[in-house]
A protein has these predicted regions:
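Catalytic cores of TIM-barrel enzymes
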Residues: 1-116
Length: 116
């Protein structure tokens, strides 16, 4: 079965040749550009012949645009929280909506477009 046929059959509760397979991996400090993130995800899928890609940008991408400061240490170490924009209760009132098509989210969206 092709990857797509296997997934569609499984979702339709039909017999498959095997259970669809995927998993994710984070590539610390290698995944901050859209093209590199796409390359890493596609390479892992091809190497392991997975049925689908579970996109895995670095774990804190979703909070950076809200004002979280990261400590990016480099090497195999993942970025960690350096400073939160929330230091006192009133700080919650300063949080403004962020766009889902800009900033860190845009990096992830662009990587998915490239990988497609």
């Amino acid at each position: 079965m092709s990857h797509r046929a296997r997934i569609e059959a499984a979702l339709a509760n039909l017999p498959t040749d095997r259970t669809p397979l995927s998993f994710w991996w984070h590539w610390a400090n290698q995944d901050r550009s859209p093209r590199r993130l796409a390359e890493l995800a596609v390479r892992l899928q091809q190497r392991l012949d997975m049925d689908f890609i579970k996109f895995s940008p670095y774990g804190l991408y979703s909070v950076v645009d809200w004002g979280v400061q990261l400590n990016v240490r480099g090497g195999p170490d993942t970025p960690i929280l350096a400073e939160s924009p929330i230091q006192k209760p009133d700080d919650w009132l300063k949080i403004m909506p962020v766009r889902s098509d800009a900033g860190e989210y845009l990096i992830v969206l662009e990587a998915q477009r490239i990988a497609h």
